[in-house]
Amino acid sequence: FEFDNNGQMIPPTTRQGVFANVVRQPNLHDQILLEYGLRYVFFTDADSLDCTLTAPWFNNSPWQKTATMVPARYDIGKWFRAVNVEFMLDPGLKKFTIKEDEPLCYFGFGTEKPIEFIRFKMNDELKRYSVACSTSTSWDSWVPLANRYARFKETRMKQLVLKQIKENLVDG
C-alpha cells in the first residue's frame, strides 16, 4: 500500500494484493491508520468466549518494523461482528508492504478446550447483524460494551445469528 503526501491511497500498479482502506483520521500526528481488507468472523454457541487479536510477535514479520497492529478483544459468545485488522503506520511512512505468506496476526481464544472452526456463508441477514454490532458505537454512543452484550442477549440476537449460521454452513 502506498500513500501520497495527503495520506490518500495511491492505486496499486499490479493486480496482485489485498484491498485496504484508510478508515479514519489517525489520532497521532502524521500517522496513517490502515484497515487491512481481510476480515474474520468468529462466533460460538457457548455462553462466553474471549477472542483476542494481537500482532505476530513470535515471527518477526518485516512489516512490524514500519507499523503497529491495533490489538482487539471481544466476547464471541456475546457479540457478532467481523474483526478488522488495523495497522498504525510509523510517523511519516507513506508505503506499507506485507509479503505473501508473512504472518499477519494471531488470534487467541480464552479456553483450554479444543476449538472446532466451522465455515459458514456470510449471507445478507448475517451481514446486517454484524454491521449492527460493529457500528453500534455510532448510533448508540457512550454505551459500555458490557451493556451492549446484555442487550444482544435480551433481544435474542444470539439465537437469530446461530439459526442463520446453521442454515448457511459451507461443506468441508
Task: Name each model feature, range by range.
Residues F1-G172:
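DUTPase catalytic domain/fold
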